[in-house]
Regions:
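Alpha-helical transmembrane segments in inner-membrane proteins
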Residues: 1-210
């Protein structure tokens, strides 16, 4: 038992070191290649520290969060093919972000940086609330009822996003498309810290309960 624990710990440390290496390499690649020697220059250091590094770290965080959500869904449905979008939660997030992009709203200056993040969370919470109400109303249906509800919500949100894409202008459509493709172009240290404060505790609790 102790031997297995030590082996798992070594594997974990090895993967962690490889991940750190990939983060450093990823942050140095791009249209402007940045070496460790060039970091002595303030201009290169600013690009590496304030533009590239937040994007790479956010990509790592999002990857971990999606993997955690996938594990939860697979455990919930007892199906290794289940994914985070199965219940329509991600579609609800995309729909609310689309609404925020196509029909801009006035927010206080302090919240402008987090606008899309706020709308995405609101959209996901709305879908979660709808699914919860459906499960309470039709509890006898079990997981099949939840699955069918998720398929219906996915279809409705997809249709609504299609309508938003039709009424939006070229710039709005491009912005929505980039967001749905997982663009990290707007990643900054403040948004990374907010995302980490939500995602990291969820991943830790999930690992602890596993």
């Amino acid at each position: 038992m102790l031997k297995d624990s030590l082996s798992s710990f070594r594997v974990f440390i090895g993967l962690l070191l490889r991940l750190a290496t990939l983060v450093l390499v990823g942050a140095s690649q791009g249209a402007l290649k940045i070496t460790f020697a060039s970091l002595q220059d303030a201009h290169y250091r600013d690009i590496w520290l304030n533009i590239r590094l937040p994007r790479v770290l956010l990509a790592v965080l999002v990857g971990g969060a999606l993997a955690t959500a996938g594990v939860i869904m697979q455990g919930l449905f007892r199906n290794p093919m289940a994914d985070p979008g199965l219940l329509g939660v991600s579609s609800g997030s995309a729909l609310m972000v689309g609404v925020a992009i196509i029909f801009p709203v006035s927010l206080p200056a302090a919240f402008l940086l987090y606008e899309q993040m706020i709308f995405a969370v609101v959209g996901s919470l709305v879908v979660c609330a709808v699914i919860f109400l459906i499960s309470l109303r039709h509890h006898h249906g079990g997981m099949i009822q939840l699955l069918l509800a998720g398929i219906a919500i996915n279809a409705l949100c997809g249709a609504a996003i299609g309508i938003l894409s039709y009424v939006g202008d070229e710039q709005q459509l491009r912005q929505l498309t980039l967001w749905m493709m997982g663009s990290l172009g707007q990643a900054q240290w403040p948004t990374l810290l907010v995302a980490t404060s939500f995602a990291l505790p969820a991943m830790v609790v999930t690992a602890w309960l596993a």
